[in-house]
Amino acid sequence: MARKKTTKRKVKKNVPLGIAHIHTTFNNTIVTITDLNGNAVTWSSAGALGFKGSRKSTPFAAQLAAEAVAKAAMEHGMVKVETFITGPGPGREAAIRSLQAAGLEITAIKDVTAVPHNGCRPPKPPRG
């Protein structure tokens, strides 16, 4: 019989400062918290929380995703967070409010959405 593979338990890093990356699309919201070097500490998304289809794109789903991430980050000792927001989705403001309500102190909010210099033609809803 094969031996059981021994795996190390995940070590909780003590990271007091971090960066919250909120990526919102028309279909989903992904919230990732990294340390200052860009190494992921924790992440969550509306889809990972069990929302399916059009419910993933709601502000409520984004709020729950941000709450889950904030709780996990605070377990790692995180207190202050800088926020980078990407994308045009409906969960932008809800995610920021949720991070703040969960107890993380937001030091800066930056919108880093990539704007094309007239690149590809977007799909039909954003064109209108």
From Swiss-Prot:
InterPro entries: Ribosomal_uS11 (IPR001971), Ribosomal_uS11_bac-type (IPR019981), Ribosomal_uS11_sf (IPR036967). GO terms for cellular component: ribonucleoprotein complex; ribosome. Pfam families: Ribosomal_S11. Gene3D superfamilies: Ribosomal protein S11. Keywords: Ribonucleoprotein, Ribosomal protein, RNA-binding, rRNA-binding. GO terms for biological process: translation. One of its GO terms (molecular function) is rRNA binding. Part of the 30S ribosomal subunit. Interacts with proteins S7 and S18. Binds to IF-3. Located on the platform of the 30S subunit, it bridges several disparate RNA helices of the 16S rRNA. Forms part of the Shine-Dalgarno cleft in the 70S ribosome. This is Small ribosomal subunit protein uS11. The gene is rpsK.
